[in-house]
Amino acid sequence: MKKPIFILCLFLIIIGCSETKQAKPALDETSKETVMAESNESTFVYNESEAIWGFVIDTITGNEELTQLKPVEKEVLTGEMMEKIINKTWPRVQIKYLGTSNDTAFISIPDSEILTQQMGSAGADGFMVSTVYSFTEINGIKHVSFDFEAGDHASPGVYNRNSWDTNNY
């Protein structure tokens, strides 16, 4: 009776101590999402695939150049459509299109802290420039009036395509 119990215990010990060949995932799903979020942080701030205007690095000079990334049909473009495009392009800085008066589009940024405090000056400038250039693609729009709480990196006001020296990017 002792011999079968001894063999059974020995068998269980051997099985319990042997390595399994089943591959363990390197990261659990939560860790994967965190790593992806950290490695793709710029994707969450700026989504180039949705952008009409953006900055491209000139391979010869190494400078960033403001470039129209995709053509638009100005005849059918509306402020509401542009609001959706901007909000998809900049998911962490959500705008509200308020309306148009004469040649000015009016937008607000209810939660402007990311824009004014967290994106840095270059990120905030990139947002402001690309948003102005995108809105001024709409027929008749020459200016964009921004309403938001001022911060370290961006200020509200009325801007147009001449508000920045885009040759310095």
Label every model-predicted segment.
Residues 17-169:
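Bimodal "functional hotspot" detector
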